[in-house]
Curated annotation (Swiss-Prot):
One of its GO terms (biological process) is rRNA 5'-end processing. This is Putative pre-16S rRNA nuclease. The keyword NAD does not apply. InterPro entries: RNaseH-like_sf, YqgF, YqgF/RNaseH-like_dom, YqgF/RNaseH-like_dom_sf. The keyword Lipid metabolism does not apply. Its EC number is 3.1.-.-. Pfam families: RuvX. It comes from Bordetella petrii (strain ATCC BAA-461 / DSM 12804 / CCUG 43448).
């Protein structure tokens, strides 16, 4: 598999956690949190990050219910993934994000904003599943 840079998103209506990683090292790390409820401001910042990091694909956490079923947040994550695909023409992968925020809190050891760490957890799951 050729080396690829990846960005991952832990999508929320109030904030979006972002992580970066690549297929060579197969390691993910938190990048930043976008604190904005204004859609265009979010996409402006995402566009800047995409230009800066030039990822070949992006990963979006899919908010499934605890039983694995869909819930209202699942549709919002799918819509966000479709917007990324449509606006930027990137390959988008969806990854089950169940438990990522709890794991992020455990890793942080605090109740600080954990969205970027949760995005790194989601991306690490994707990288770990690669052949």
């Amino acid at each position: 598999m050729p080396e690829e840079t990846l960005l991952a998103f832990d999508f929320g209506e109030k904030k979006i956690g972002i992580a970066i990683g690549n297929t060579l090292t197969r390691q993910a790390r938190p990048l930043e949190i976008i604190f904005s409820e204004i859609r265009e401001a979010r996409f402006a910042r995402i566009g800047q990050l995409l230009q800066q990091w030039q990822p070949q694909r992006v990963v979006v956490g899919l908010a499934l219910a605890s039983d694995g079923g869909e819930q209202p947040a699942t549709a919002r994550c799918r819509r966000f993934a479709n917007q990324l695909r449509g606006r930027y023409g990137l390959a988008v992968e969806l990854v089950d994000e169940r438990g990522s925020s709890m794991e992020a809190q455990r890793l942080l050891g605090t109740h600080a904003p954990d969205d970027a760490v949760a995005a790194a957890v989601i991306l690490q799951r994707y990288l770990d599943a690669l052949p």
